[in-house]
């Protein structure tokens, strides 16, 4: 295995696609992999609701315990699957705080704090940091689309406002905004941007991100059906919807 990795296509800027399956100290990556919030499968958590439309915190507590007990590597609260875009501001903030409190440092908690309003994304991110999240998942601006340079400035503003790690979130099918590989390269130079959730579905683009950024921007699959190909491109893991149902897979 070691000889194959040295002599084959996977050079020092890449990693073994079987890294997640073998605990080989010789394959521990350098760069920002050492700063990664988690490795493996994090759950893009649903937000349980009561019939009257209020968040069901009793069920959320049960769900969090179920995830932790069955080996989930991280909890992602208020992401796309958690319907963050349809939560009120109070619901959004309360859900983040409750999750941090109930997880109680058993596994990392990552909060979705993105917005199409840069200042509001900064405020959400600062609040999430203040209540103790381990990292942030920050989607691109949506509806109000910007240029690639605008994206860089948007993420710089957020990253400069907090001290905790940030995972970029690229899902152009929902936002209408794509983070190009070249923009990923620029963003990877920012110290506390430590990964990207890539849900574009474009393996060619993901391959180019891996090639340009190497270990300075670990990639998480944002689509459950692309876990294997992304692992083969040295992916860090997955932020999974399927894990809501079966986190032990």
Regions found by a protein language model. Name each.
Residues 36-43, 49-176:
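Active-site beta->alpha loop and helix N-cap motifs at the rims of alpha/beta catalytic domains
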Residues 174-249:
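Catalytic alpha/beta core domains of metabolic enzymes, predominantly
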């Amino acid at each position: 295995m070691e000889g194959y990795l040295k002599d084959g296509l996977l050079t020092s800027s890449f990693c073994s696609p079987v890294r997640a399956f073998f605990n080989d100290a010789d394959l521990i990556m350098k760069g920002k992999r050492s700063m990664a919030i988690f490795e493996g499968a994090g759950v893009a958590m649903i937000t349980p609701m009561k019939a009257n439309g209020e968040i069901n915190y009793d069920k959320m507590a049960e769900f969090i315990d179920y995830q932790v007990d069955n080996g989930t590597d991280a909890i992602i609260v208020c992401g796309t699957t958690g319907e963050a875009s349809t939560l009120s501001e109070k619901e959004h903030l309360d859900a983040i705080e409750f999750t941090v409190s109930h997880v109680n440092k058993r596994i990392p908690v990552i909060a979705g704090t993105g917005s199409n309003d840069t200042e509001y994304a900064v405020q959400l991110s600062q609040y999430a940091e203040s209540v103790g999240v381990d990292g942030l998942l920050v989607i691109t601006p949506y509806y109000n689309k910007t240029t690639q340079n605008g994206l860089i400035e948007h993420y710089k503003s957020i990253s400069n406002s907090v001290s905790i790690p940030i995972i970029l979130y690229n899902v152009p099918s929902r936002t209408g905004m794509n983070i190009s590989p070249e923009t990923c390269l620029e963003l990877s130079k920012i110290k506390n941007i430590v990964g990207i959730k890539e849900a574009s579905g474009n393996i060619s683009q993901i391959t180019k991100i891996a090639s340009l950024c190497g270990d300075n921007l670990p990639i998480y699959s944002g689509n459950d059906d692309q876990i294997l190909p992304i692992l083969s491109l040295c992916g860090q893991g997955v932020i999974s919807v399927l894990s809501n149902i079966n986190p032990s897979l």
